[in-house]
């Protein structure tokens, strides 16, 4: 039987990444602590449980839970395209053993770099962006990000967007691991909404 709490945590992670991408594309900036929460998920390769991926605190997924509840009610077409696009990309990654191996190899070296740089330093964001470009983008079904050209043309913003997309893939991988399927959006949407509301109200 599906564990809807774990599935909802992971989906909230995907939606939180998608929301950060949207905010960066439109405004060029995001809440730095929410960004740090997302980036930190990439370092959680052997978590004790699902919530541990997000620092063990439900409040770290507040934005994602809000976004998930809005999306399950179909409120934002662009955002809908982002988070469903992340799930589609993860599906392609899941079927590509070489890409999965390369992604794991690149992620493995992140702690070494963190000995020299903070997670939010430009060098780290550039490294994470390059992982997305090198490993995820070639899988196809590329996500077309819409926003202000003023921000989208800036390398710093591009790196942040790609780093956030990578964190979205991380949560999408987790979503699959804990039993998430696209059928649930058709047949268990009410259950997902109710679970998200329950978690949100406990924050």
From Swiss-Prot:
Location (main, coarse): cytoplasm
A Pfam family reported for this protein in Swiss-Prot or TrEMBL: DUF489
Gene3D superfamilies in the cross-refs: HflD-like
Record localization: Cytoplasm; Cell inner membrane
Keyword Endoplasmic reticulum appears in the UniProt entry: no
Disulfide bridges in this chain: none
Residue ranges crossing the lipid bilayer per the database entry: none
Domain of life: Bacteria
Topology of this chain in the membrane: Peripheral membrane protein
Keywords annotated in UniProt: Cell inner membrane, Cell membrane, Cytoplasm, Membrane
GO cellular component: cytoplasm; plasma membrane
UniProt family annotation: Belongs to the HflD family.
NCBIfam families: PRK00218.1-2, PRK00218.1-4
HAMAP family in the record: HflD_protein
Record-given protein name: High frequency lysogenization protein HflD homolog
Organism: Histophilus somni (strain 2336) (Haemophilus somnus)
């Amino acid at each position: 039987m599906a564990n809807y709490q774990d599935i909802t945590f992971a989906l909230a992670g995907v939606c939180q990444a998608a929301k950060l991408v949207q905010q960066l594309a439109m405004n060029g900036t995001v809440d730095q602590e929410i960004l740090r929460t997302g980036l930190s998920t990439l370092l959680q390769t052997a978590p004790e449980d699902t919530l541990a991926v997000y620092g063990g605190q439900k409040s770290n997924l507040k934005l994602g839970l809000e976004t998930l509840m809005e999306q399950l009610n179909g409120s934002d077409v662009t955002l809908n395209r982002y988070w469903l696009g992340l799930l589609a990309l993860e599906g392609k990654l899941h079927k590509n053993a070489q890409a999965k191996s390369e992604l794991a190899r690149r992620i493995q070296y992140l702690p070494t770099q963190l000995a020299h740089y903070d997670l939010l330093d430009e060098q780290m964001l550039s490294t994470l962006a390059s992982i997305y470009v090198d490993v995820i983008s070639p899988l196809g079904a590329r996500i077309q990000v819409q926003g202000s050209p003023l921000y989208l043309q800036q390398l710093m913003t591009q790196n942040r967007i790609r780093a956030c997309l990578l964190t979205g893939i991380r949560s999408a991988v987790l979503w699959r691991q804990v039993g998430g399927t696209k059928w649930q959006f058709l047949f268990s949407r009410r259950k997902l909404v109710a679970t998200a509301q329950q978690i949100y109200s406990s924050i």
